[in-house]
Amino acid sequence: MKNRKQNYFTKWNMFLLVMFLCVSVYGQKKFSSIIPGKEVKELIYKIVDADTLKMELYFPDNLKKNKKYPTIVFYYGGGWNGGTVDQFRDQAGYFASRGMVTVLVDYRVKSRHGSTPYESVKDAKSAIRYLKEHAKELHIDKKKMVASGGSAGGHLAAAVALLPGVNESTDDVSINTKVSALVLYNSVVDNGPGPGGFQHERMGEAYLTISPIHNIKKGAPPTMFILGDKDHLIPVSVADDYKARMDAVGSRCEVLIYEGQGHGFFNIRVDTDEYYMITTREVDKFLSSLGYIKGEPTL
């Protein structure tokens, strides 16, 4: 009886610890569930294993019928375990106001679908293929597509651009998933066995097929990498290594390190939107330098 009680209390204490960590890490963040004055278009992009996966799209004001627009696709973070499309809704609303089509992608995660990171990558790539296949009706300029995300979502963004494999068996692989730019927010990019590798054991022996940093080759798209120097999950050395590998193949990579900031600092918080504003302006300037938007940031 004593052992059963001890086991019960150990499990309860672990539950409380997990809940405390979730509140500590995520409780201060303030995700938006709507964008005032903006209509959202919800589409099913994939049905797999009885799971229906959707994406949400926002369009520029005064949308012109036959015009194609630069597009940015956001993948939320959550360690491939959870998360919500609300994470990047504020950024999506802002860049729609700057004249882009913006997309929030849902994908399979462990807590809801019992999936692995490999299924998450497959979904991320399926979403890009769907957008390219339906580019005309969705006003998407396929030559000006940006993938973006935070943490595990940033891993998915880098994956669609860099990984040649990890495709859904039902996908039309004649449609490539390459994008023309990446915006990575404290992103997982290294799944290798070294000190900077994230959850290497979880990836297994096939880690090279899913680790973006190990698949950087000539032609890798221009990238902005945003990171805090107090991030407890992604060391600054990983961003430096990513940039070094990008430099080696002749691709542009801007790394922005924010002093004293931890994981997820770029989101709006209950008490401040300072770093949301700062990082969004930097992304705006990066996209402007690529010719995707015009003028100075408007926030």
What residue spans do the PLM features occupy?
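N-terminal cap/lid segment of alpha/beta-hydrolase-fold proteins
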Residues: 29-67
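Primarily recognizes the serine-hydrolase "nucleophile elbow" in alpha/beta-hydrolase
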Residues: 126-198, 207-208, 212
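Conserved alpha/beta-hydrolase "acid-adjacent" motif
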Residues: 232-238
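Alpha/beta-hydrolase active-site loop
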Residues: 115-136, 278-282
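Short amphipathic alpha-helix adjacent to the substrate-entry channel of hydrolases
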Residues: 85-104
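Short beta-strand/loop motif that positions the catalytic acidic residue
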Residues: 225-227, 231
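Short beta-strand element of the alpha/beta-hydrolase
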Residues: 67-77
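C-terminal catalytic histidine-bearing segment of alpha/beta-hydrolase fold enzymes
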Residues: 56, 240, 247-299
